[in-house]
């Protein structure tokens, strides 16, 4: 395909125009009085949202240079969302401010490489100051406040905080997995799973012990884990007899249990001779093997597998795991208080953490995170309902962002919200970090841009942006504008805070993309295809001659 090329100022201005188009659409959503944006869908109802990254993803521009500029800023929003789960609009506003000031100076004759160096040094200094001023999250109320701001609903913030403590047994669990699911009811409900749950239920309904609730409850059972299929009862019989002598029930988790092995277990359960439940192992391939190994470590058992030289015929009671209780429904199985060795469980948890850090796939990371939570505490499910499909989609997305926001707060701490932390961190850039020339210009550009998020929040709240920024810059650290009420308060005390991870990620990603914009000397884009010629004799009625 033929290409078109733009150089110097033309190239940079084309990119900037695309950036501004996207940023102007996104920044109206910033702050407690931010507006919504309606996104048309190719099918179904439109989406109404105030989530920066969702809006950015939908914007496709026609001009090839503008399109590239918009794509670069989308990357800022996406990267910030991936790292911190929030702060996408703040990152976009910062990027726009940095690029606008930077291009003005480049057009006036400044050296882009000098400005880039100044921006990088200033960003590193401000990041350092933000991390130093961050306060550790210590209470459920602080998490509720942070998540509530992100979700724009204090009640949702409270549910998220409750979930993070519930899966840790009353303590804050940093590894907690909180999933958000759609519900047919109105409002937001929290469901906490104690222990390890996986989404496979009993193979036969005859295994149920509670016919009203259609679930099988096994108290203090033995747990048999098998990596292959079980179909021959002769293989299983010696082990079944040993378990029967103990008077304990048995949970069998295998790739499948079928044929005479399954029918024998069912018949013994119906007669009341022996209580057991057979369940298919979750997952496929290597992921199934890994989950079986997790269960083995959690319950103190050994996976019966030919790979390690173990077979069902020779299996003995010491190879079986134990748990205080197992609850099996038609859809899922929950193992409560497995009898595994705590040192081995900790070792497995650390191994999974390392795998998460080394994984490049978002999907793999998500699955590893779920395994980690099941081993180290439990899983909470927030069920969300709404009156319409549009509202449900928007609400679910907000809650998912708020969950990630709360986790970011627990990870690195919190700073004053409302754009105040960035503005007040600008004091570390006094004297231009003792730099000179274009590097000092780069520092000035960052110092100026740090007020942009606060100014936009004030603007969206109908206030005079310059006046607000000037007043906040003279207030004590941590005090600033509560845009919801228009009052100047101690933001941390009022529960208006942001995770420092969100704030620093927004600045770092915005600075990174701004440096790329300023040092761009040429843009190569696909040449637009010429429009197809009209059909001969076509008229206004669609070219069909009607």
Swiss-Prot record:
E.C. code: 5.6.1.7
Which GO annotations describe the biological process of this protein? protein refolding
Q: Which residues bind ATP?
A: 29-32, 86-90, 418, 482-484, 498
Please tell me whether the keyword Isomerase is annotated for this protein: yes
Q: What are the record keywords, sorted?
A: ATP-binding, Chaperone, Cytoplasm, Isomerase, Nucleotide-binding
Name any GO cellular component annotation: cytoplasm
Q: Name one Pfam family in it.
A: Cpn60_TCP1
Q: Which residues form a coiled coil?
A: none
Which transformation does this protein catalyse, written as a reaction?
Answer: ATP + H2O + a folded polypeptide = ADP + phosphate + an unfolded polypeptide
**UniProt keyword annotation of Translocase present:** no
* GO molecular-function terms, A-Z: ATP binding; ATP-dependent protein folding chaperone; isomerase activity; unfolded protein binding
UniProt superkingdom: Bacteria
Cited NCBIfam families: GroEL, PRK00013.1, PRK12849.1, PRK12850.1, PRK12851.1
PANTHER family reported in the protein's UniProt record? 60 KDA HEAT SHOCK PROTEIN, MITOCHONDRIAL (PTHR45633)
Task: Return the similarity comment.
Answer: Belongs to the chaperonin (HSP60) family.
Quaternary data: Forms a cylinder of 14 subunits composed of two heptameric rings stacked back-to-back. Interacts with the co-chaperonin GroES.
Function according to Swiss-Prot or TrEMBL:
Together with its co-chaperonin GroES, plays an essential role in assisting protein folding. The GroEL-GroES system forms a nano-cage that allows encapsulation of the non-native substrate proteins and provides a physical environment optimized to promote and accelerate protein folding.
Name of the protein: Chaperonin GroEL 2
Which species expresses this protein natively?
Corynebacterium diphtheriae (strain ATCC 700971 / NCTC 13129 / Biotype gravis)
Lineage of source species: Bacteria, Bacillati, Actinomycetota, Actinomycetes, Mycobacteriales
The gene it comes from is groEL2
């Amino acid at each position: 395909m033929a290409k078109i090329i733009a150089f110097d100022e033309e190239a940079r201005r084309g990119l900037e125009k695309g950036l501004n188009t996207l940023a102007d659409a996104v920044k109206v959503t910033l702050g407690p009085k931010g507006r919504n944006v309606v996104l048309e869908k190719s099918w179904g109802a439109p989406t109404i949202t105030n989530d920066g990254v969702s809006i950015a993803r939908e914007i496709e521009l026609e001009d090839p240079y503008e399109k590239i500029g918009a794509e670069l800023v989308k990357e800022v929003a996406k990267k910030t969302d991936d790292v911190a789960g929030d702060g996408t609009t703040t990152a976009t506003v910062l990027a726009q401010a940095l690029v606008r000031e930077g291009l003005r100076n480049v057009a006036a004759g400044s050296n882009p490489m000098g400005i880039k160096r100044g921006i990088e040094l200033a960003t590193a200094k401000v990041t350092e100051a933000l991390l130093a001023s961050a306060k550790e999250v210590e209470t459920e109320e602080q998490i509720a406040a942070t998540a509530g701001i992100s979700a724009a609903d204090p009640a949702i913030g409270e549910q998220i905080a409750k979930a993070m403590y519930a899966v840790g047994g009353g303590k804050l669990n940093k590894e907690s997995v909180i999933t958000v699911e759609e519900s047919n009811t109105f409002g937001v409900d929290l469901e906490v799973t104690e222990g390890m749950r996986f989404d496979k239920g009993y193979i036969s309904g005859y295994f149920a012990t509670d016919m009203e609730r259609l679930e099988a409850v096994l108290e203090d059972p033995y747990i048999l884990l098998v990596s292959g299929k079980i179909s021959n009862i002769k293989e299983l019989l010696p082990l079944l007899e040993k378990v029967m002598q103990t008077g304990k029930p048995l949970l069998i988790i295998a790739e499948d249990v079928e044929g005479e092995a399954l029918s024998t277990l069912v018949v013994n359960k119906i007669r009341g001779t022996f209580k057991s439940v057979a369940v298919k192992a979750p997952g496929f391939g290597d992921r199934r093997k890994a989950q079986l190994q997790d269960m083995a470590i959690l319950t103190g058992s050994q996976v019966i597998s030919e790979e390690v030289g173990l077979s069902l015929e020779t299996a003995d009671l010491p190879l079986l795991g134990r748990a205080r209780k197992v609850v099996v429904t038609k859809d899922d199985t929950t193992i409560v208080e497995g009898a595994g060795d705590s040192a081995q469980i900790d070792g497995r948890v650390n191994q999974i953490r390392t795998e998460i850090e080394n994984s490049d796939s978002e999907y793999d990371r998500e699955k590893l995170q779920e395994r980690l939570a099941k081993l180290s505490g439990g899983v909470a499910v927030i069920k969300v309902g709404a009156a319409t499909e549009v509202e449900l989609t928007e609400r679910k997305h907000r809650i998912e962002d708020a969950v990630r926001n709360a986790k970011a707060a627990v990870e690195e701490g919190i700073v004053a919200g409302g754009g105040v932390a960035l503005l007040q961190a600008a004091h570390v850039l006094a004297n231009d970090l003792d730099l000179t020339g274009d590097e000092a210009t780069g520092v000035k550009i960052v110092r100026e841009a740090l007020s942009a998020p606060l100014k936009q929040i004030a603007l969206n709240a109908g206030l005079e942006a310059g006046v607000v920024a000037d007043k906040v810059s003279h207030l004590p650290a941590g005090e600033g504008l509560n845009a919801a009420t228009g009052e100047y308060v101690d933001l941390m005390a009022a529960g208006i805070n942001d995770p420092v991870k969100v704030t620093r990620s927004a600045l770092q990603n915005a600075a990174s993309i701004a440096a790329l914009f300023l040092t761009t000397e040429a843009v190569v884009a696909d040449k637009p295809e010429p429009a197809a010629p009209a059909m001969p004799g076509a008229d206004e009625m669609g070219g069909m001659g009607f």
